[in-house]
Amino acid sequence: MAQFYPGSTKIAENRRKFMNPDAELEKLREISDEDVVRILGHRAPGEEYPSVHPPLEELDEPEDPIKDIVEPTEGAKAGDRVRYVQFTDSVYFAPAQPYIRSRAYLWRYRGADAGTLSGRQIIEARERDVEKIAKELIETEFFDPARTGIRGKSVHGHSLRLDENGMMFDMLRRQVYDEETGRVKMVKNQIGDEFDEPIDLGEPLDEETLKEKTTIYRIDNIPYREDKDLLEIVQRIHQLRSEAGFSPE
């Protein structure tokens, strides 16, 4: 069995669940395929997928045994262009966070490239593949409408204080809390273009549920120093890397 992540705390357990492709993610909301297309903003709903090359079955390419071993994704088969979805995760108990996203993406999704920054995480893939990936990431416990942002640009806000409704700061105000319904609406796509009709992302998770689901160690929940198994592994790696770098005799 793969050793996804060390540790004996709930945080470590949550991280292993995200990384393990055999672990079923809890579905928390329903987002239509059309709304996923609208959120991404790469093409109009109903528009044909633009392509960068003919379908693979129409290409006359040299024999390559690797092609018989590796099954192409649906997007690769069709010749789709490469597109992306990018998420920002609040440090205040967001379910996911950038490095865990990268490791989870590379375990769970084929034909995808993940890029990690301090407060946001991008995944690139063929267009119809990235739509499928984005749908799963938004509908499941990877996402919370208040603490997770879908942001293609102007991503900042992950480390800023939450507002009075527990919403993470977003200078473009793509996700808005409706005080009458207690639900979050997405009023702009990931790059800030306004929708004609908002998209309902559902109710934010309460604080206790977020603390139960988060993959972030925090002093006001579960500090990483309480996870002795994790510390032992991290310290061992650090020691071995340091000693190897100094080339001790």
UniProtKB/Swiss-Prot annotation:
CDD domains linked: MCR_gamma
Keywords: Cytoplasm, Methanogenesis, Transferase
Region described as Disordered: 43-62
Binding-site list for coenzyme M: 120
Biological processes per GO annotation: methanogenesis
Keyword field contains Endoplasmic reticulum: no
Cofactor binding comment, as recorded: Binds 2 coenzyme F430 non-covalently per MCR complex. Coenzyme F430 is a yellow nickel porphinoid. Methyl-coenzyme-M reductase is activated when the enzyme-bound coenzyme F430 is reduced to the Ni(I) oxidation state.
EC number: 2.8.4.1
Entry keyword annotation includes Transferase: yes
GO cellular component labels: cytoplasm
Catalytic activity: coenzyme B + methyl-coenzyme M = methane + coenzyme M-coenzyme B heterodisulfide
Pathway assigned to this chain's UniProt record: One-carbon metabolism; methyl-coenzyme M reduction; methane from methyl-coenzyme M: step 1/1
SUPFAM superfamilies, alphabetized: Methyl-coenzyme M reductase subunits
Location in or out of the cell: Cytoplasm
Cofactor: coenzyme F430
Assembly and oligomerization: MCR is a hexamer of two alpha, two beta, and two gamma chains, forming a dimer of heterotrimers.
Family label: Belongs to the methyl-coenzyme M reductase gamma subunit family.
Matching NCBIfam families: met_CoM_red_gam
Summary of the function given for this chain in its UniProt record: Component of the methyl-coenzyme M reductase (MCR) I that catalyzes the reductive cleavage of methyl-coenzyme M (CoM-S-CH3 or 2-(methylthio)ethanesulfonate) using coenzyme B (CoB or 7-mercaptoheptanoylthreonine phosphate) as reductant which results in the production of methane and the mixed heterodisulfide of CoB and CoM (CoM-S-S-CoB). This is the final step in methanogenesis.
Protein name per UniProt: Methyl-coenzyme M reductase subunit gamma
Species assigned in the record: Methanothermus fervidus
Protein encoded by which gene: mcrG
